[in-house]
Amino acid sequence: MSDDYEHFREVQYLRTWWYVLLALLPAGLIYWGAIQQLYFGEPWGNNPGSDGLMWFLLVVFGILFPLFLLTINMRTTVTGTVNVRFFPFMSKPRRIGRNDIVTYSVVTYSPITDYGGWGIKGTSMHRAYNVYGKRGVRITFANGSTVLIGSQRPEELYTAITAMIRTGTARVVL
């Protein structure tokens, strides 16, 4: 089987209600202020800024900030390596080769108590990549360090890693 064969692909976006609210609440507030000041000509706030400042705020917080928040995603693929990329914070994916894996297993974890929340979390010895949820695959390396890859389909990810390393030396932990 070619290393280019894709055993697994998952793209997870941050789409929880509180996250969408975080993206849209400042945008809505800026839209309201921009309409008041730029369209109706009524200065917005107790100490209003110039129209140029209002245009700047509209572009940055009304358009760019929500677009940025809504494009954050985590892509996980399994080909000849396990690849995890948390866009836009990682320019290149983290690649885990089949020979780097000592053990791996499907786990249920607490993102907040185990890793301090969602995103790229943990320490250099125990890293987690997760978007939401509380399930994933934990991979252990020879030096004892671990990486947890959060997934909405952890059993499929586990099966894909198994298929990837069929000819390798990793040990499966059920």
How should these model regions be labeled?
Residues M1-G49, E156:
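N-terminal membrane-targeting/pre-transmembrane regions
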Residues D3, F8, M125-L174:
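A membrane-cytosol interface segment of integral membrane proteins
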Residues Q12-A23, G62-P66, R85-D100:
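Generic detector of contiguous secondary-structure segments
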Residues G45-V59:
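Hydrophobic alpha-helical transmembrane segments
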Residues F56-R75:
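Transmembrane alpha-helices and immediately adjacent membrane-cytoplasm interface residues
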Residues I72-F87:
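Membrane-helix interface/capping segments
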Residues V78, I96, I149-Q152:
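A conserved hydrophobic position in a structured secondary element of the catalytic/binding core
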Residues R85-V147:
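Non-transmembrane, membrane-adjacent beta-strand/coil modules in membrane-associated proteins
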